[in-house]
Amino acid sequence: VQEHHITDESNQATAYRTDSPTTVRNNNPFLYKDPDNPYAVKEVVLPVGGIYERDDRKMYSYDFRLTATYNTTIKNAHIINLFAGMEVNSADRHNTWFRGWGLQYDMGMTPFYDYRIFKKGQEEGSKYYTLGDTYYRNNAYYFNGTYSYKGRYTVNGTFRYEGTNKLGKSRKSRWLPTWNISGAWNLHEESWFQKAQPALSHLSLKASYSLTADRGPSTVTNSRVVINAYTPWRPSAGDGESGLKIEDLENSSLTYEKKHELNIGADMGFANNRINLVVDWYKRNNFDLIGDVTTQGIGGIIKKKGNVAEMKSNGIEISLSTKNIKTKNFSWTTDFIYSHIHNEVSKLETSVRVMDLVAGSGFTLEGYPVRSLFSIPFMGLNEIGLPTFLDQNGDVSTTGINFQERENLSFLQYSGSVDPTDMGSFGNVFQWKGLKLNVFITYSFGNVVRLNPVFKSYYSDLTAMPREFKNRWMV
């Protein structure tokens, strides 16, 4: 339960009663002007009291899990571990929200309201209270098997079959099998490895290949058509009515976001494990990624959610840990982590606007990283000092840029990815008896950032000029 008490003398409640002088009254959006009276002026509709808001959220859920395990060792050489199970998840969520007008906190919590506050809300289409229910169901069946020969060679396999009511109606879309197969070779378990010890304390080589999946963003729920109630705008409260609108078109084939991943790595230790190094290389192929699909508008809206994209990525991760000093009362350890990633959108079945690509948050375009930033080419100043740019037609222009252009995007200049390509951390832990000090830094680079758009066509005397103005025409 969340309660919000907006008391009588609070700034928010006072704003509903501020109607002087005339300039303030005419620009105060919290006052009410009766549309039924052509000569009306804005009036106060919350003369006394404050506002009380309450938000109730309840959830009833249960989880049922059944598992079985089998472990055995044959002739002290063959180690077998088997694990199987099933899981059922259910969650029902209920939400209610309410706003009460005119609650007099200084008068014994007595409500006093003007009927016009409800008339104002009805004409604006705002809600007085809301109720909402969501239902989530998920079933999963899984199996895992591991075989190891004397701890030297290990093979592991996992299979999972999962279904959820969030995705499409067809069995192919709603249910998905995923799997993982991996293997490891512990070279330090070999008899000949003792010759390399303790300089090389341990060495393991590992590899895996898998198909994994994700249900996608929690906001995507259009495996069935999404229809919401709403109050259409009418010029007066007497003409008001309720209605239904299509929020999102049905996509019965909406399915999981999937990923194939190949991982190869090595785990090694040196100097009696005082130095440990882990190196992993991976290659990923993401497909059936969920995004907006541009439709012909036949269903009433031009966009719906669907599996529209594919992405390829690869990278390397390095982790180095050292025990620099180790005594009875004092120790000093260092950890260094570095990772590099490269990704590229290989398929994108949706349309993109110029505005999306030049926005500072980055956007997706086929053939480029997932969050790429583009720029409109700057062509210098013209003879009267105005900045000029290259437009979508290949012409140099000051005002001819069509930010809604979807077809001709080749004139844009690729600036880079807004996501870092290299990142990691460097930390040191000092421990003396019962005291511990952790000193660490994180770092990232390889990305670009759109500069703050501080330049405007109009400035008042109240505007503070930023330092970027000093070199405003330098490129």
Predicted regions: what they are:
Residues A15-Y16, F469:
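Solvent-exposed, well-ordered loop and adjacent helix/strand elements within mature globular domains
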Residues W97, T221, G306, I325-V418, ...:
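Conserved small-residue
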Residues N144, D267, F378, P387, ...:
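Short, surface-exposed charged micro-motifs
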Residues V1-Q12, T23-D34, A40-P369:
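Extracellular/periplasmic, surface-exposed regions of secreted and cell-surface proteins
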Residues S10-A15, F98-L103, S351, T442-F445, ...:
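Short Gly/aromatic-enriched secondary-structure transition segments
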